[in-house]
Curated annotation (Swiss-Prot):
PANTHER family: ARGININE EXPORTER PROTEIN ARGO (PTHR30086), ARGININE EXPORTER PROTEIN ARGO-RELATED (PTHR30086:SF20). It is a multi-pass membrane protein. It comes from Bacillus subtilis (strain 168). Keywords: Amino-acid transport, Cell membrane, Membrane, Transmembrane, Transmembrane helix, Transport. Coiled coil: none annotated. Belongs to the LysE/ArgO transporter (TC 2.A.75) family. GO terms for molecular function: amino acid transmembrane transporter activity. Its main location: membrane. One of its GO terms (cellular component) is plasma membrane. This is Putative amino-acid transporter YisU.
């Protein structure tokens, strides 16, 4: 009887652990999949760098930022952040100015030209820009902290750690995959014409996001 109960409890715990992992994976993909400035930037760096490993500063920076936000969310910081309206205003203003500049830089990138080296981001610049597009987006931050933080409340102990680890793993895998996809895209686009269109569209996405932040600031 005792052995039977032990087996039953072990199976039950395994079920809840697997449920936490699957929940984390599905939730993280749902938050990270939509087209945004962060995704566009990582894809772009994968395409613009001569070798895929040269895009690692952007990938690592974005992944570390997401990891930090996820850890803070599970740690319960969402409650504090949501009680500080000034936080959203400051982040929105910073995001507005940064995205205007970032859009201008992206618009002027010319793939496969003599000036390509001039516009290729250095490792430090990649890391800084990736961190900026990750952290200067108040809505993305509040969504990540709020949704993941709230969802993590139903778990405790090992299940909470597994849920958090699953969310973090999805983030790293996704950004690595985006950079690889960008590199593959560049190998197909030998003329650079498609990449030029991608750059223009990327700049448009950044300016649209900046415009949204500007309207939100004005309305508030």
């Amino acid at each position: 009887m005792t052995i039977s109960l032990m087996i039953e409890k072990k199976c039950e715990r395994s079920f809840f652990s697997m449920n936490a992992i699957i929940h984390g994976i599905v939730l993280a993909f749902g938050l990270i999949l939509p087209l945004g400035v962060q995704n566009v930037f990582i894809f772009q760096q994968g395409a613009l760098q001569k070798h895929i490993w040269r895009a690692l500063p952007a990938v690592i920076s974005a992944s570390v930022c997401d990891t930090l936000l996820i850890v803070l969310a599970v740690a319960g910081v969402s409650v504090i952040v949501q009680e500080l309206p000034v936080f959203e205003t400051v982040m929105m203003a910073g995001g507005f100015l940064f995205l205007l500049y970032m859009g201008w830089v992206t618009w002027n990138i010319r793939p496969n030209t003599s000036q390509n080296e001039k516009h290729t981001f250095t490792p430090k610049k990649q890391a800084a820009f990736a961190a900026a597009v990750s952290l200067l987006n108040p809505h993305a931050i509040l969504d990540t902290i709020g949704v993941i933080g709230t969802s993590s409340l139903q778990y405790s102990g090992l299940e909470k750690w597994l849920f958090m680890a699953a969310c973090i793993a999805v983030s790293w895998i996704w950004f690595i995959s985006l950079a690889i996809a960008g590199r593959l895209f560049q190998t197909i686009d030998t003329s650079g014409r498609l990449m030029l269109i991608v750059n223009k569209c990327s700049a448009a996405v950044m300016w649209a996001a900046a415009g949204y932040f500007g309207v939100s600031l004005f309305c508030n």
